[in-house]
């Protein structure tokens, strides 16, 4: 395995002292990069992820080009679902489309048991390739969390309000619990397999869970998240686990009492306020990705965020959501350099 010579991200995830703030970006691999766009002229997303050499190349690009302190595996949260019998297609300009949406108990019952080594060996091979030969920074594996996956599976695709998902949850609580258990078991096994293959940390993306109230989260979602995190920690006690959601500041207190290591926040929450709500966790975030299209505002906001971030150990600079395709790659490089150079000065000042 290649030796990790830059462990800033891992130190920050453990709330240890660092000499500069680590940086990485959600959706840093692909999307805005010309090299990636050229590949997409020839291959679909799933075709890229099925070819370990190409997928590893895409994953490593932002490390080489932007100088980020961690790589995140290039794939989609939908990647494991075909292994459960879900007919999913990634449509350009739309996103994931499910051709056999969940509507009944029978639909849930038909979902197959997911075995990562059998269903997604190409994902594990990509991780091994990166960890063994290509990276000197930590590699982050990830999975979609059960609510977000269920929202696609029930709605049949992206949604603005998640009415069908929430009404299914309220109307069929027993069936919902079975669906959560199946997705939770898949997610735990998937994350453990990624760590076994060489991932240094894992992130749970619960992109749409902010649509739920805290009471509904505690009743319908928290049990499965606790199960996932507990199983991953039982298998890999020292591997950092990150929870990332959007518009979910009202759920921070729920995550404080789980064995998570890092909590990602978006631009609706300040770093200082987040620390008050999750004092035992490292914080990741929280630049609004829209500012990347307004360079002066971007650096102004980055400075404000940094001023809060450096006050205590356990801070990782990131966005509050993913990089847009329109973002110029040179802006990400400029921002990375700014965070590194400016944070080093601020940390020296103490």
UniProtKB/Swiss-Prot annotation:
Belongs to the uroporphyrinogen decarboxylase family. Its main location: cytoplasm. Homodimer. One of its GO terms (biological process) is protoporphyrinogen IX biosynthetic process. The gene is hemE. Pathway: Porphyrin-containing compound metabolism; protoporphyrin-IX biosynthesis; coproporphyrinogen-III from 5-aminolevulinate: step 4/4. It comes from the Bacteria. The lineage of its organism: Bacteria, Bacillati, Bacillota, Bacilli, Bacillales. This is Uroporphyrinogen decarboxylase. It is found in: Cytoplasm. InterPro entries: UROD/MetE-like_sf (IPR038071), Uroporphyrinogen_deCO2ase_HemE (IPR006361), Uroporphyrinogen_deCOase (IPR000257).
